[in-house]
């Protein structure tokens, strides 16, 4: 089966929402039906962007240190990683008519940096104007989760935690509300799923919906 066009799918949600798991499962399912698909993530996805990711996520400052990344420094790092990702991963995928599944994209910046940390929305929009061009996701899945359950999942993670796994419960509540608010503004391209349902059932529901868009 041959891809007819570039198709861009994004998974969004707070830490512990299951978005990384579902993005991997969708990638495998699409690959099985013979379509050309890549799985990527933000921040990251390319060699340069992964280096920036290390700077963003590593806790460089001791807990008792007064020195922290300013919220605009933090945001600019994310946007720099995004530009690298778009130039070196997304744009080549467009030219090759690939399906791209991305674990996080622009809505995470708005939910975390704008709504969560108070970064000026116009500042982010201005930078996006230059780095995004006409690139927009065709489908975005927002995975809604019970915050307490998400925090429990984070505690059980065997991988090394980063500073974004250590925010307060109130911050995650605020971020999740932001994701849902964003999704409700464009119901044609956003799909909100409650991740409290069975993982396998959710996996099947997402694939069925994506398949209906890819194969017409």
Give residue spans per PLM region.
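Conserved beta-strand scaffold positions in the cores of enzyme catalytic domains, especially
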Residues: 37-39, 140-142, 190-192
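Hydrophobic anchor at the beta1->P-loop junction of P-loop NTPases
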Residues: 9-11
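NTP-dependent small-molecule kinase module
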Residues: 2-3, 27, 148-216
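Conserved lysine of the Walker
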Residues: 19
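A glycine- and Lys/Arg-enriched "phosphate-lid" helix/loop adjacent to the NTP-binding pocket
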Residues: 104, 109-177
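ATP-dependent small-molecule kinase phosphotransfer cores
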Residues: 35-132
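Walker A (P-loop) phosphate-binding loop of P-loop NTPases
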Residues: 16
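Hydrophobic positions on the alpha1 helix immediately C-terminal to the Walker A/P-loop
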Residues: 22
């Amino acid at each position: 089966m041959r891809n007819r066009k570039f198709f861009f799918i994004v998974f969004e949600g707070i830490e512990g929402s299951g978005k990384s798991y579902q993005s991997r499962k969708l990638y495998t399912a699409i690959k099985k039906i013979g379509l050309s698909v890549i799985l990527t993530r933000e921040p990251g996805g390319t060699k340069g962007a992964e280096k920036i990711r290390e700077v963003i996520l590593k806790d460089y400052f001791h807990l008792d240190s007064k020195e922290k990344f300013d919220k605009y420094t933090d945001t600019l790092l994310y946007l720099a990683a995004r530009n690298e990702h778009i130039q070196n991963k997304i744009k080549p995928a467009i030219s090759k008519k690939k399906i791209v599944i991305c674990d996080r994209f622009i809505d995470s910046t708005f939910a975390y940096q704008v709504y969560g940390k108070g970064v000026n929305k116009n500042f982010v929009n201005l930078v996006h104007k230059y780095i995004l061009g006409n690139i927009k996701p065709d489908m975005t899945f927002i995975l809604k989760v019970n915050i307490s359950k998400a925090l429990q999942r984070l505690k059980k993670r065997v991988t090394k935690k980063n500073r974004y796994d250590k925010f307060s419960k109130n911050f995650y509540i605020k971020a999740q509300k932001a994701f849902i608010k964003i999704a409700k503004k464009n119901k044609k391209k956003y799909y909100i799923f409650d991740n409290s349902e069975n993982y396998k059932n959710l996996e099947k529901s997402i694939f069925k919906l994506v398949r209906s868009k890819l194969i017409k």
